[in-house]
């Protein structure tokens, strides 16, 4: 039997296992039985996988059998040739067949003219030489199946005669089972593939996670009995004073000529946090409270880098991460004496937002209960990577504004006409803390039926919200605030700031727009993708349907 030289031997490497190829390429020089015949020793790249395959080949040489790829093709050709000779008398020849047979003969001659190395089986070779072949009778176990790509890949038979009959009859019954015809695959760019994936996802309804479903169909009273007391207690605990003192003690030596003050903010301070929530801290170094930076300046980043060194050298603090490239860079650290993780920044906007949320939660407790529930729902749905707690809180506020239960934020803010406005950059950050009776609003009693009813309507509302044309706008607090018109509806201070800083306008060309009610150029959901929004909408729809079902638990009819 003839085989090719070593450099062109494995013409169809995908047909064989990698271990088998490595074995024969390694041992070929000592397997040839003809004197003077040589074959190059092909050295594979020395990798962990290569060494593993070589070891396997040496341990199981009898299980790795050789067969030239042409052997199988020649076997099938001879089968067909013998069948035609037996069934056709006299044999027939057409111009196309004559051309193909001539090309086959020329190909065989070219192959033999290359002086292929002749290899003997082990039983005919000298001891230690020869190759273990696949036995000829094994070829009989391999059968072919022919399918037609023009007929939805329909199987037309296991013999060439049936395949020829199918073609000669011009594809009879091209789609006998009414299967959808698959178009021929075409080359797609990465962008086209991504667009196709996004389009396909839009037609798929994502099922609500089991943990979220269990919370929704379970006793709603348990959610608040477990979460609310903890959240309310975490607003003020002695550990915060210890953290503030230790932080000032740690950082003051690094900035001896600048006043330093620490402000606490975030979900722990507003009353919707839990024991695993981070404590957000704004460190004012050098009276920078009223300084606004759309993105952190080099000076701000330099301060944070200097602060990082103090955390690295401290025995009371453990540095977790330094997120320098974020819009608001933060240092994530853990205060070891209390075990509380802290997010430290040099931006005062978070503290200003927290003051607003505290006022709303205290004036309308229903808001706090709803935010605790949807925060827990968001975590169980694993949506927190794209939709933050602050974002979903603003959505709750906007929804209650539409129910005339909360005032628009614009109504609360004090304009600088009376010289009372507190500004951080161009943004008004203070507001009139009027009672709801002064605002003409009703304060609802937060009972379980009331909370559940508003939660059901909340999820139903945002399941049907037109995110393409409208935005969630707590600043204006009205329904159907159009994305195309929002910038013309804001006060002159916004227009002046954006005119001087065109790159700092609010990002409206996003799948989802939720506007910060204080920093008006900030879309807090700009990170939400189309698929993320579709998932959120699907979850809202399913949650609203589950909350629509009447509760069988008598405890849910009573207040806390």
Curated annotation (Swiss-Prot):
Which cysteines are disulphide-bonded?
none
Q: Where is the PAP-associated domain?
A: 455-522
According to its UniProt record, this protein's enzyme class is transferase
NADP in keyword set: no
The record's subcellular location field reads: Cytoplasm
**Phenotype seen when the gene is deleted:** Viable. Fertility is significantly reduced.
List the catalytic activities from the record: RNA(n) + UTP = RNA(n)-3'-uridine ribonucleotide + diphosphate
Please name the GO terms of the biological process aspect recorded for this protein, alphabetically: negative regulation of pre-miRNA processing; positive regulation of miRNA catabolic process; regulatory ncRNA-mediated gene silencing
InterPro entries per UniProt: MTPAP-like_central (IPR054708), NT_sf (IPR043519)
- Residues of the region (Disordered) are 169-197
Requisite cofactors: Mg(2+)
Signal peptide range equals none
Summarize the impact of residue 280 to A. Abolishes catalytic activity
- Which residues fall in a compositionally biased region of kind Low complexity? 176-188
Name under which the protein is recorded? Terminal uridylyltransferase Tailor
Its source organism is: Drosophila melanogaster
Q: What is the lineage of its organism?
A: Eukaryota, Metazoa, Ecdysozoa, Arthropoda, Hexapoda
Encoded by which gene?
Tailor
């Amino acid at each position: 039997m003839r085989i090719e030289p070593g450099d062109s031997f494995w013409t169809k490497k995908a047909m064989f296992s990698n271990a088998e190829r490595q074995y024969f390429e390694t041992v070929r020089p000592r397997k040839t039985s003809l004197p003077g015949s040589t074959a190059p020793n092909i050295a594979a790249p020395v990798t962990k996988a290569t060494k593993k395959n070589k070891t396997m080949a040496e341990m199981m040489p009898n299980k790795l059998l050789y067969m030239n790829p042409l052997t199988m093709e020649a076997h099938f050709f001879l089968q067909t040739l013998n069948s035609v000779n037996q069934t056709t008398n006299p044999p027939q020849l057409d111009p196309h067949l004559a051309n193909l047979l001539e090309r086959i003969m020329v190909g065989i001659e070219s192959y033999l003219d290359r002086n292929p190395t002749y290899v003997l089986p082990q039983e005919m070779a000298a001891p230690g030489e020869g190759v273990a072949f696949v036995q000829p009778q094994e070829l009989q176990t391999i059968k072919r199946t022919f399918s037609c790509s023009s007929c939805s890949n329909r199987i037309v038979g296991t013999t060439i005669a049936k395949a020829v009959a199918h073609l000669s009859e011009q594809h009879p019954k091209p789609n006998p089972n009414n299967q959808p015809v698959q178009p021929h695959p075409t080359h797609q760019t990465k962008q086209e593939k991504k667009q196709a994936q996004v389009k396909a996802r839009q037609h798929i309804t994502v099922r609500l996670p089991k943990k979220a479903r269990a919370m929704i169909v379970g006793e709603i009273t348990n959610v608040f009995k477990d979460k609310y007391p903890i959240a309310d207690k975490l607003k003020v605990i002695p550990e915060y004073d210890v953290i503030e003192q230790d932080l000032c003690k740690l950082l003051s030596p690094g900035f001896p000529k600048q006043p330093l003050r620490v402000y606490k903010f975030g979900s722990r301070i507003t009353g919707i946090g839990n024991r695993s929530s981070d404590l957000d801290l704004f460190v004012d170094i050098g009276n920078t409270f009223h300084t606004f930076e759309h993105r952190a300046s080099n000076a701000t980043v330099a301060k944070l880098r200097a602060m990082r060194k103090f955390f690295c050298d401290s025995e009371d603090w453990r540095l977790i991460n330094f997120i320098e490239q974020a819009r608001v860079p933060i240092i994530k650290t853990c205060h070891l004496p209390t075990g509380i993780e802290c997010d430290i920044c040099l931006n005062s906007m978070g503290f200003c937002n927290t003051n607003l949320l505290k006022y709303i939660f205290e004036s309308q407790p229903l808001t706090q209960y709803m935010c605790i529930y949807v925060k827990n729902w968001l975590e169980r749905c694993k949506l927190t990577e794209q939709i933050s707690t602050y974002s979903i809180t603003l959505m709750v506020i906007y929804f209650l504004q539409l129910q005339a239960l909360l005032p628009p934020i614009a109504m609360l803010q004090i304009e600088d006409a009376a010289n009372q406005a507190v500004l951080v950059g161009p943004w008004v950050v203070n507001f009139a803390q009027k009672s709801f009776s002064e605002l003409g609003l009703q304060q609802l009693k937060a009972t379980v039926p009331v909370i559940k009813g508003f939660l059901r309507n909340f999820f139903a509302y945002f399941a049907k919200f037109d995110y393409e044309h409208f935005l969630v706008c707590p600043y204006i607090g009205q329904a159907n605030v159009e994305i195309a018109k929002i910038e013309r509806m804001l006060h002159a201070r916004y227009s002046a700031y954006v005119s001087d800083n065109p790159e700092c306008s609010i990002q409206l060309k996003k799948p989802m727009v939720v506007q910060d009610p204080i920093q008006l150029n900030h879309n807090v959901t700009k990170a939400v993708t189309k698929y993320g929004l579709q998932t959120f909408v699907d979850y809202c729809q399913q949650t609203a349907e589950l909350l629509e079902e009447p509760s069988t638990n008598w405890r849910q009819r009573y207040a806390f």
